[in-house]
């Protein structure tokens, strides 16, 4: 019974004393979501291009982070950056709002472990160093590069059970998902914790009513900026492809 389980979550699980840089969720529709650029999740040539970008990119750019504020949520639809161009080919219709789940997810990870960096700053880095594909979102290799640049312990896995073990071991995880519970095309989401039988998710394309549509109803619980999905439903409906894991080794976690 989802209503009963929601009450359990409300009483026992949700305790979010976190600093969130995004302060309100946007009001969008299912139709709006269906018009965004599809983030590639599995094409072999796409992955090869990402590897080429990684092998050719500088790994030690001097980047100044802001103050560490603990677990941080960013919406790619935040008005401060949603209309900023995120394109490697000068396409002004490619913005952080339409195409920026990759840099938004990575910005959440780095801000939550090291210090503040915003989605538009991360998007500029990805474009500058070759991790923005022409028409298919962000290359997967951007995340390994991000871990290199910001000195974060990093690993990858494909099995959900392995990802859950990583979550239990103080990792934040970017999950690449194909068409399913979280997206109509392809999308990156951030797994920030595990509470009981629920995975805690930061979705940069979360909007009011996203999980009220027929195909998603009853499969997710939204509380504030966090989406809770049971492990069973994630396994069945997320259509996940790969997990990019970042270890939080801080001892002063907020």
Which residues does each PLM region occupy?
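Noncatalytic regulatory segments and standalone regulatory/sensor domains
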Residues: 194-254
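Solvent-exposed, well-ordered amphipathic alpha-helical segments
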Residues: 51-55, 63-64, 76, 140, ...
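Active-site-adjacent structural segments surrounding the nucleophilic cysteine of cysteine proteases
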Residues: 1-131
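Active-site-adjacent substructure of cysteine-protease-like catalytic cores
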Residues: 153-206, 210
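Cysteine-dependent hydrolase recognition
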Residues: 94, 103, 112-139, 153-156, ...
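Stable alpha-helical elements in mature extracytoplasmic
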Residues: 97, 102-106, 118, 122, ...
